[in-house]
Amino acid sequence: MNLSYTARQFLTLPALIWVCLSAQAGRPLTVDDANVNDTGVAHVETFWSRGADGARVLTIAPTYSPLQGLDLIAQDARTLSGGPHSQTIQTKLQLSQPRENGCHTALVFGATHWQKGQGQSGFMSANLSCDLAPGALHWSLVSSRSPQGADVPSLGVAWEHVMGSWTGHVESVAQRQAKPMLGVGLRRDILPGLQLDGTWGRMGGQTLFSLGSKWQF
């Protein structure tokens, strides 16, 4: 997606709010889902985000699905003001197939490396997505280890709802020793294979937002 994003304090490493919390969630979600691309399909997500501390981050995240139920994901997140710069690689394995009015699951495994001597960390998440009559519900439980070796768990919940040509969502993320995040977002396909999206949220009394795109081919 959208993360995820842990292995750091939300306010001190703002880039990670979009990197490790839910692993790399599909835009514009922060909470990861249990969905994957169709076999042989790739996409590239590019988005600009403002963290709760005001830092601006540019993120580029390509994804490719070489096999059914498998996504291979890379991500580069660069703080434009010269702060943290990270690269993330992760694998998402879908454990059960999506079904109408039912639920499916996925596991995610990944690692993030920070430049400028800030170390690296690993993470994994268990994701559940349910197709319900009015929309879709997503849960993501993440276990992440900080560069200092501390376990930093988080739990995210998101609700998506289709409104004509737009899809909106509301989501919340709770992480140990951090203020909870509450956010909303919108996405829309403007051309075949091209999506534009945006998010707005609050965390610890501060505002965070993002603008992005997703190109699928």
Regions picked out by a protein language model, each given a short descriptive name:
Residues 1-30:
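Cleavable N-terminal export/targeting peptides
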